[in-house]
Amino acid sequence: MSVCGGAPPPAILKEGDLEKRSDSFLQLWKKRRCVLTADGLHLYSDARKRGKAKVLRFDSLAKLECVEWKGERVYFTLVTLGGQEIDFRCRERSRWNAEITLALVGFQNRRAVRELRERKEHQARDNGERLRSWGP
């Protein structure tokens, strides 16, 4: 997690409340105001989004897993590249788990295309070739 201030976040894909399980011994659930963007999940402890957000950046996340439905709530876990697990829950109808999954997969796809493009451009430079445009 990083702390983001100053610059406004990119375009908002979804905004609303999630509950995050604390890392403390008691593991209490704490409500967070959340903003989902194309680059990550911004968590605010204040409902009015005052102060700095903790950001779970998609470049540091491996996957969303362990989705469970209990009553009207959905429980899910975000797993970092380092293996840390961060637990969340939300109302089933809010579809946070689906929205985060779609945004994370979209981010990973864009990164894979960018890395492939860079690798092809590097190979073309090494071979003295010119590469046709792949789009944006």
Curated annotation (Swiss-Prot):
A GO CC term assigned to this protein in UniProt: membrane
How this chain sits in the membrane, per its record, is: Peripheral membrane protein
Alphabetical UniProt keywords = Cytoplasm, Membrane
Which cell locations does it reside in? Cytoplasm; Membrane
Enumerate the SMART domains for this protein: PH
Q: Name one GO biological process term.
A: positive regulation of apoptotic process
Q: Which residues form the PH domain?
A: 12-105
- Main location per the UniProt record: cytoplasm
Molecular-function GO term, any one: phosphatidylinositol phosphate binding
- PANTHER family of this UniProt entry? PLECKSTRIN HOMOLOGY-LIKE DOMAIN FAMILY A MEMBER 2, PLECKSTRIN HOMOLOGY-LIKE DOMAIN, PQ-RICH PROTEIN
According to its UniProt entry, what is the function of this protein? Answer: Plays a role in regulating placenta growth. May act via its PH domain that competes with other PH domain-containing proteins, thereby preventing their binding to membrane lipids.
Instruction: Give the family, as the similarity comment puts it.
Output: Belongs to the PHLDA2 family.
The free-text domain note is:
The PH domain binds phosphoinositides with a broad specificity. It may compete with the PH domain of some other proteins, thereby interfering with their binding to phosphatidylinositol 4,5-bisphosphate (PIP2) and phosphatidylinositol 3,4,5-trisphosphate (PIP3).
Q: Write the protein's name.
A: Pleckstrin homology-like domain family A member 2
Species this protein is from? Xenopus tropicalis (Western clawed frog)
Taxonomy of the source species: Eukaryota, Metazoa, Chordata, Craniata, Vertebrata
